[in-house]
Amino acid sequence: MFTFILLCLLVGALAGFLAGLFGIGGGLVIVPTLVYLLPIVDVPESLLMSTALGTSFATIVITGIGSAQRHHKLGNIVWQAVRILAPVIMLSVFICGLFIGRLDREISAKIFACLVVYLATKMVLSIKKDQVTTKSLTPLSSVIGGILIGMASSAAGIGGGGFIVPFLTARGINIKQAIGSSAFCGMLLGISGMFSFIVSGWGNPLMPEYSLGYIYLPAVLGITATSFFTSKLGASATAKLPVSTLKKGFALFLIVVAINMFLK
C-alpha cells in the first residue's frame, strides 16, 4: 500500500500540473496509470477500467477546484460561454457514466484509446493550419456540444478539456480563455462523473476495501494531495507561455498518451 500511495502522489503531481496548463482535468494521465497500478491493491481485471474512470473523475473534482480558482483570478473564464455548456455536460456525463460503468473492460479501454487518438489528431491539424472561425456560440450549439462532450468525457474519464478547448476556440474564444473555461467545466463535470460511477458500482462485492462504488478512495487521496497544488502552477504557466507553445504542448501530450494506450 505504501508503494501504491507513493506512486499516486507522483502521478498527482504530474496530472495536476497538466490539468492546470491544458484544462484537461488530468484524466488522460490518471486513467492509463491507474490501470497499471490498481492490480497492486487487488482490483480485479474486469473492473480495472471502471475503477480507473470513476477514481479519475473523483480526482478531477479536487484538481479542478485549484485550476478553476487560478484561472478565475487570471480572468480566463468566459461565463457567458459556460452558463449553458457546463450544466448540459454535467447531465450528459452522469447519464453516460451509468452505462460506461457496466461495459466490458476491453471495450471501454478501446473507446478510451480511440478518443485519445482523435484528440491528438485534432490538435496536430490545428497546429499545421490556423482555424478560421466561422461559427458562433449559440444556445443550441452549446446544448449539442455539451451532450457530445459529456458522452466522450464519460468514456475517457477526463475533464473534457480536449473537447471543450477546440469547441470554444472554433467559436471565437482565444485559447487561454478556452482553457480557463474548460477548467471550470471540468470541475463540474468531475462532480457529475464521480456520482455516476459511485451509483453504477455501489455494493459491488469485488471492489477492495476503502472503495465507494467504482472509486478507490486511497488513490483519490494520494493523487489529489499533490495535484491540487501543482494544478495552480500549471494554470499560472498559461499566462507565461505563447499560444503556439500551448497548442504544440497539448498535441504532443495527447500523442504520447495515445501511443502508450496502443502499446499497452
Curated annotation (Swiss-Prot):
Record keywords: Cell membrane, Membrane, Transmembrane, Transmembrane helix, Transport
Localisation per UniProt entry: Cell membrane
InterPro entries reported for this sequence: TM_pro_TauE-like
Any one annotated GO CC term: plasma membrane
Signal sequence interval, chain numbering: none
Pfam families: TauE
Membrane-spanning ranges: 4-24, 28-48, 49-69, 81-101, 107-127, 147-167, 183-203, 210-230, 243-263
Membrane topology listed for this record: Multi-pass membrane protein
Predominant cellular place of this UniProt entry's protein: membrane
Cysteines paired by S-S bonds: none
Family that this chain belongs to: Belongs to the 4-toluene sulfonate uptake permease (TSUP) (TC 2.A.102) family.
PANTHER family hit by this protein: MEMBRANE TRANSPORTER PROTEIN HI_0806-RELATED
Protein name: Probable membrane transporter protein HI_0902
